[in-house]
Amino acid sequence: MSQPPEHPGNPADPQGGNQGAGSYPPPGYGAPPPPPGYGPPPGTYLPPGYNAPPPPPGYGPPPGPPPPGYPTHLQSSGFSVGDAISWSWNRFTQNAVTLVVPVLAYAVALAAVIGATAGLVVALSDRATTAYTNTSGVSSESVDITMTPAAGIVMFLGYIALFALVLYMHAGILTGCLDIADGKPVTIATFFRPRNLGLVLVTGLLIVALTFIGGLLCVIPGLIFGFVAQFAVAFAVDRSTSPIDSVKASIETVGSNIGGSVLSWLAQLTAVLVGELLCFVGMLIGIPVAALIHVYTYRKLSGGQVVEAVRPAPPVGWPPGPQLA
């Protein structure tokens, strides 16, 4: 009985014929290792226990953007006082009531402190009335007021209260304007919740003390220091820096762009003066606009950012078609 011939290369006859592509390698034989840098083709899975090689030194995902308003270095380029005025006016018109009401409330509080202090000082002082009659028989009187120790104490306490209220107002308005610069929603209450009030008070005392010392040196050094320290309170409110660091940061910021700082200061002064010329009622607009210019300048010169003004969207609907005559 005949049997079919065995084909060369059959597994039953390992010695016969050449092994084809579908044959199995002998035991202990492995495929040659891949050349350096060779990996599995895209889309395949790595065998268990195999890890991809680490990236070369210095390689990694790109860093994310820094938080708004918190730069790592100064980038004063790109500041324009015209842009500052335009941005500030746009933001004021979008938040007019929210900005005007706090300024009005602070003005009433300041007037109350000044009026109460003046009234108590006069009431606690000694007054002496002297009557005069001239040769024509016309009588007149003069009143001499002599301040007593009690009146002096009241005046001193009134100055302290006024100074604290001014710093509180400054910090509160800056807090609201900084939130506007960050694009956060603000309310009237935002301007009465100043951030970092303790740092602001100490920073304000430091500025007043150094300005007073500079004023003793022929006045001009005090004016110069007051100018270069104009952003110290903003740094304390916005970045929680210490009083000394706030003053140093303000000096560095102003020094990075003296021209822009001067133009911004003049723009703020103009806004307030125009408000005074309008029977002081215009200061309800001038003070918020000046504060917004101040915040814009501080952010731009210190390398921070502000949310740019948003243009109104076009009306919803299909554009009109061609009109037939």
Curated annotation (Swiss-Prot):
Highest taxon above the source species: Bacteria
Compartments, as annotated in UniProt: Cell membrane
GO cellular component: plasma membrane
Keyword tags: Cell membrane, Membrane, Transmembrane, Transmembrane helix
Biased composition (Pro residues): 24-70
Topology versus the membrane: Multi-pass membrane protein
Primary site of residence: membrane
Region (Disordered): 1-75
Transmembrane segments: 96-116, 153-173, 205-225, 273-293
Claim: Transmembrane helix is one of the keywords in the record: yes
Family: To M.tuberculosis Rv2560.
Protein's recorded name: Uncharacterized protein Mb2590
Species per Swiss-Prot/TrEMBL record: Mycobacterium bovis (strain ATCC BAA-935 / AF2122/97)
